[in-house]
Amino acid sequence: MRIAILGGTYNPVHIGHIFLAKEIEYLLNIDRVIFIPTCNPAHKLIDENVSVSNRIDMLKLALENEDKMFIDDCDIINGGITYTVDTISCVKKKYKNDKLFLIIGDDLFQNFDSWKDPQSIVSSVELVVAHRIYKERLKSSFKHIYIDNKIIPISSSEIRNRIVNGLPVSYLLPFGVLKYIKDNNLYVKKVNV
């Protein structure tokens, strides 16, 4: 089986994530896309008002009608700071005989050499770089594949900011995720009394 790994905070998951997963399915002939929500990413802070279970619930809602997309909670179970090399080790134990593709955006790829044990990563999986912010292909000494995906100019941080500022986000999120955010009062300004 050909399996793509998409790690991220998914805070919240949005249509850009799902669109990229669909592009990956098509462009790389992928049998399964595994979304891996990070526990505590090494290079990013997560809003403390949104729990791990909130993020997983939103992912479940976003993927409920997708037959090739699944969630793996290995980073959540392992806890602590999340490093990609450790995530891959966990995934490889479950999918021993499958071909694994690690998908990262070019925004992350530009600093890939500073990641924990990048050589081990490229030795374990096919590193696939997706356009996220750059139209041109970045160069690197690390073995990688670039896909010519469409750039969807959206980010979870932009969505959170729009919600805080009372701006519409309905066209940026799967319906179930939008409803969950509203029902659970996520990402809104907390008023101190």
From Swiss-Prot:
- Which Pfam families is this protein grouped with? CTP_transf_like
Question: Any idea which GO molecular function terms this record carries?
Answer: ATP binding; nicotinate-nucleotide adenylyltransferase activity
Pathway listed for it is: Cofactor biosynthesis; NAD(+) biosynthesis; deamido-NAD(+) from nicotinate D-ribonucleotide: step 1/1
Task: Report the EC code(s) recorded for this entry.
Answer: 2.7.7.18
Q: Tell me which Gene3D superfamilies the record gives.
A: HUPs
What catalytic reaction does the record list? Answer: nicotinate beta-D-ribonucleotide + ATP + H(+) = deamido-NAD(+) + diphosphate
SUPFAM superfamilies, alphabetically? Nucleotidylyl transferase
| Class in the EC hierarchy, top level | transferase
An example GO BP is: NAD biosynthetic process
Q: Record's InterPro entries?
A: Cyt_trans-like, NadD/NMNAT, Rossmann-like_a/b/a_fold
Decide whether keyword Amino-acid biosynthesis is in the record: no
Recorded superkingdom = Bacteria
Sorted alphabetically, which keywords does the UniProt record give?
ATP-binding, NAD, Nucleotide-binding, Nucleotidyltransferase, Pyridine nucleotide biosynthesis, Transferase
Q: Among its keywords, does the record have NAD?
A: yes
Task: Say which family it is in.
Answer: Belongs to the NadD family.
The job of this chain, per UniProt, is described as: Catalyzes the reversible adenylation of nicotinate mononucleotide (NaMN) to nicotinic acid adenine dinucleotide (NaAD).
Q: What is this protein called?
A: Probable nicotinate-nucleotide adenylyltransferase
Taxonomic source organism: Borreliella burgdorferi (strain ATCC 35210 / DSM 4680 / CIP 102532 / B31) (Borrelia burgdorferi)
